[in-house]
Amino acid sequence: MSIGSEVMPSLNPSFTPINWEQATPDTLLERIAEAKIVGMGGAGFPTAEKIALAQKHPPNFVIANGMETDPGVNADKVLLERHLDDVLTGLRIVAKILSAVQSFVAIAHERTVQDAQSLLIDNETVRYLKPTFQNGAERELIQILTGHVVKDNSFPAFDGCLVLNVHTLFAIAEAIAGKPLTKRLVTVNDETRWIDIGTPVEEILESRDPIRVGCYATGKRPRANEVLTAKVNAISNDKSVRALPCIHCGWCDEACPRELPVESLFVLAEQLKPNLDVQDALNRCNDCGACVIACPSNIHLLDHVRALRQRNDTERERISRATQARIRFDAREQRLRSDAMSSDAKRSERMQQQHKWQ
């Protein structure tokens, strides 16, 4: 299984190249579904389904998300430097499917912005944005570029906004050209290269130290026999193995772009039990990893936040099951009482009847 620096996806004999400018939106969407393309910015949601959902809520804005905000990760940057034209082709394919009124390209590298400006066509805009932790988030990106605020209880597609990672758009262009999704660019300890999807992560980064799937700040420790998937943009060494005790400096609270009480969440997480009083804060956390980078003790605070969130999810599920069980029990008791009363009434009625033998 090759792990090369410049090996590109090869032509699949089962995929016939499509002239996207002449093809119908249904034909293009069908190819995207056939290629099994998923969100490659981390979500992993089937792209064809996401586009189809946006189709139902015109008018549409399409955003190419090149805001790579994970510290030390350069996969999107390298892709844009080497295959910007393919990314723009993917953007135009999606815009055609949706009959989009405007397309945006958000990039965190000024030189690439200059390159993109010379390739734009009508109804396309490229914007340079600072690579902050929040600027790469879907909802924040929509607000910055379109001025529209997506409600917390809604989805961007419901508001006619579709955000796709630049890797996803590249994969779309490749699929339309007859090339399946078999590889992706991955940053492995500051080196970015093409790696086969399906490669065991332990083979990608051979290290005596534990590793994380994703960048150090937001990645997770791999499961047994875990392999590279299309949504993984980095493999990193795990610095948290050298973590020191918390010194209560408060840097994590200051670093959090959503002003969450990170240190308090960490203290609660260390108690190894659920705490539903902080559920709102856990819901507002978007796992950006800013607290992890800020921590001078190398504590992976996001691990603890995720663990507390998982314990709360389990607790809410337990409460829900207990509530449903209580409702079923009360309904059964009521039914038994009703049956008993009905039986007593019928018995009393029979006793009062005039029988033939009397």
Positions of the model-derived regions?
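Iron-sulfur (Fe-S) cluster-binding modules
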Residues: 1-39, 56-57, 61, 85, ...
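Mobile "lid/hinge" segments at catalytic clefts and subdomain interfaces of large enzymes
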Residues: 52, 56, 67-68, 171-174
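Gly-rich Lys/Arg/Thr-decorated short loops/hinges at beta-loop-alpha junctions or inter-strand turns
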Residues: 62-76
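Hydrophobic alpha-helical positions that pack around
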Residues: 60, 99-201, 205-209, 215
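Ferredoxin-type iron-sulfur electron-transfer modules in oxidoreductases and energy-metabolism complexes
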Residues: 235-243, 251-253, 257-335
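A glycine- and small/hydrophobic-rich beta-loop-beta segment
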Residues: 212-247, 251, 280
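Conserved phosphate/anionic-ligand binding catalytic regions in large, soluble enzymes, centered on
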Residues: 34-52
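Short, glycine-rich nucleotide/cofactor-binding loops
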Residues: 76-85
